[in-house]
Amino acid sequence: LENFKAQQAEILAAKNAHPLIFIAGFFLTYVTITGLSIPGAAIMTLIAGALFGLVIGIVVVSFASTIGATLAFLGSRYVLRDWVQSKFGERLKAIDDGLAKDGAFYLFTLRLIPVFPFFVINLLMGLTRIRTWTFFWVSQLGMLAGTIVYVNAGTQISQVESTAGLLSPTLIGSFVLLALFPWAARGLLAVVNSRRGQ
């Protein structure tokens, strides 16, 4: 943890020296990771909270993750369609059925509670008829709650000064929130779906 804090201090110094360039570099890195479906988005989100704080971290991650997801979506639709079809085609029927039944709300539920991995959703949605703009704004809205939870956890990690800090009520609360979020989201969606069915 001490090594992490030492590295964090150096990174923060670089950020403070050239804040706009640093944020732009982080943003492009996040977009690239997401667009190429490389694992690490969750860690990058925590780091964003540690480096930029809650508000800026949320803004950076929200747009970077959505733009990256949309690039993956477009790549699947126009470049990698055959490969995605052969790799994940067995899951496509569930996506098509969900969109046929609930439209864009189905994508919203997948973003809120991912039944499929994040990158698989991006790729498979590219094979559907959903419009690019709809994919973009629904994805951004659906991922926002999770982004807030993860960035908030990152802000707490940045404040840990020693191993004892790992047991601080605030940090523990942040990770409890991370664990409870999918269950809370599932309950909320159940209520929404029940009202929609009335």
Say what each PLM segment does.
Residues 1-26, 62, 66-122, 127-133, ...:
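Membrane-interfacial helix-loop-helix
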Residues 27-31, 47, 58, 62-66, ...:
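Residue-level signature of the transmembrane alpha-helical core
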Residues 30-59, 115-122, 146-149:
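Transmembrane helix boundary and interhelical junction motifs in multipass membrane proteins
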Residues 32-35, 109-112, 172, 176:
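Hydrophobic alpha-helical transmembrane segments of multi-pass membrane proteins
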Residues 33, 68, 72, 146, ...:
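Alpha-helical transmembrane segments of multipass membrane proteins
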Residues 45, 49, 76, 125-127, ...:
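Helix-capping/transition residues at the boundaries of transmembrane alpha-helices
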Residues 138-143, 166, 170-178:
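Pore-lining and gate-forming transmembrane alpha-helices of multi-pass membrane transport proteins
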Residues 147-160:
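Transmembrane alpha-helical segments of integral membrane proteins
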